[in-house]
Design a protein with these regions (language model features):
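C-terminal motif of bacterial Sec signal peptides marking the signal peptidase cleavage site
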Residues: 16-20
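Beta-rich interaction/scaffold domains
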Residues: 21-152
């Protein structure tokens, strides 16, 4: 009798342990938590002033990689800024930048001429000659935070 009871107990334990896998929990809760977690610049056009071999002043443009330039993200004040100004001759009107958000939130940028928002695309150049406002929305679409970005 003991020999028949052990396989029966193993089968019952197997059925009970596999029964917990039958629940199909398809409800997914999106997070309301949102923040900008990273901000980096790309290549910027910079004008360099130099003298030619004849002693005449001349200028030339060069695309310089500023991805290593440090930016601070103040989560309390919702501000993003660089502690050191960009070098002389950098054109801040056409800047490529990359923005990372918490929980893959949606990042939008406010228009300079109206109150409309558009989806931020890191392949489009952005005018940072004036402070810009970025909005990051949570995955649930309920919560958002507004950040002011200053590039000096």
């Amino acid at each position: 009798m003991k020999i028949k009871l052990i396989p029966l107990m193993v089968v019952v334990c197997g059925i009970l342990s596999l029964a917990s896998c039958l629940n199909d929990d398809s409800d997914f809760v999106y997070s309301d938590d949102t923040a900008i977690t990273s901000f980096t610049l790309g290549k910027l056009n910079q004008v360099f002033h130099t003298k030619s071999s004849q002693g005449k002043d001349s200028t030339y443009r060069k695309s310089v990689d500023y991805s290593g330039h440090k930016f601070y993200i103040d989560q309390v004040k919702c501000e993003i800024y660089n502690p050191d100004s960009l070098p002389l001759g950098v054109n801040a009107k056409k800047v490529l930048c990359s923005i990372g958000s918490k929980n893959a939130g949606y990042v939008g940028i406010k228009s300079m001429t109206s109150d409309s928002l558009k989806y931020f695309n890191s392949t489009d150049s952005t005018d940072f000659s004036v402070p810009r406002e970025f909005y990051v929305y949570s995955n649930s679409g309920v919560a958002y935070r507004k950040y002011t970005v200053r590039v000096n």
